[in-house]
Amino acid sequence: MKHLQELPLVSVIMPVYNAGDFLVPAIDSILSQTYKNFELIIVNDASTDNSATVLAEYKKKYPRLITIISLTKNRNAGGDACANIALEKARGTYIARMDADDVALPSRLEKEVAYLESHPSVFLVGSNASVINKTGNTIGDKLEPLTSSEIYQQYFTFHPLIHPTTMFRREFKGKPFSYRIKYSANNDYYTFFSLLCEGGKFANLPEKLIQYRIHGKNDTFVHMKKKFINTLRIRIEMILKKGYRPSPKAVLTTLVQGVIIITLPEAVITQLYFLSKGITKASFPSFATKPLLIVKQKVSMLG
């Protein structure tokens, strides 16, 4: 077995905004990793709950392992902008993204490092995930395509990466990686779609290496109509500026997505998204039942 110093350093970066209810299991899951050569860099985006107090306690216990960057004013630019601040401090060969409300399985870092070490041509690796609710009960799974070619083909119709499962190399084509902040949301989708079009290879491991938490306040499920417009702009940009060529089926799927998202209430859209990802135990608002029956056959096209 290699000594700790011989293993590649992993920089785990975690943006935090008002995540006090879930911070303890999230941080503990990183501290409990079987892979020990890592640093944890947390950016607190001016949280107004008890996040700062929780983080201060961890900093006292692990002063060398954990770095806390506290912003005094909320940047209102999302987690990816905060992640860029963490990246400026990162020393690792590999970067692992972690969200403050999720739980990493103990072998996550070990398996992702092993994959990147044995696949030098792959820039990024992610995994599948179990989906849990606010109290930690499993309510479904998030399953994504595994190979680079499958990910490339499906990127136009949905985001085939679970962001908090991803680990990637510190550099892309000789330059330090950073998130490309261009839109009000969806900048991870924009960044990784751009890298994919620029020759980056991605992969997903079949194992479920995190518990992805849905608790009603996830940024992913807020303002979904607005985010779809951003996504549409990104897709068009990839065609016009990056040379991406979607299949006819992908174009048709995007049109169906547009019709559904424009015409249905946002609450129904969210539940359809849950269904499309196999999250079958999420609760449905009473007014959503009838529309869901009408469009249920089209769920698989939401991506």
Stretch-by-stretch model annotation:
Residues K2-Q5, K182-A185, Y189-F193, C197-G303:
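C-terminal subregions of glycosyltransferases and related glycan-biosynthesis enzymes
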Residues L71-A90, K111:
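Glycine-rich, basic loop-to-helix element that forms the pyrophosphate-binding segment
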Residues I95:
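Short aromatic/hydrophobic "clamp" motif used to bind/position activated sugar donors
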Residues S107-I139:
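Conserved donor NDP-sugar-binding/catalytic core segment of glycosyltransferases
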